[in-house]
Amino acid sequence: MCIRDRFKTRQIGKPVRFVELAQEINNSMPAYVVSRIIERMNKLEKPMKNSKILIFGVAYKKDIRDTRESPALDIIENFNSKGVEISYYDPFVDSLIVDNKQVNKETSQENFEKYDMLLMHTPHSEFSSINFSKINVPIFDATGSEFIDDAERI
């Protein structure tokens, strides 16, 4: 649910239950994504502490640089608390600070295989040129993106 819709429902002055439910679901998704990745890592017998996860796209929406309200921030914060080493790959976001710490920006596709897990968070159009099938790292797709074939999905 976009910020504009929440703002408009507040202007009405009465609760709109459908909007409230959508917001509750949206708010719970970062924790859900983290829990699914933990399950996947457990199946692969990889401990979360000191694991390396690369997040593809940290912007709020596709093909923009705005990270305000992005669920990626909550995901990163959650992983940080578990001792996971987080990096991101995003052609639109030059730098990112979460928990008063600079998040490492991955700049080279040649480094993708050094990670334990890849998370597709914001499916920027530019990612369609990446051949994900040639990357020998498990992928969790939180977006249902059309350019990843072999990934665990929400």
Give the positions of each predicted feature.
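Structural/interface elements that position substrates and couple domains in central-metabolism enzymes
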Residues: 4-154
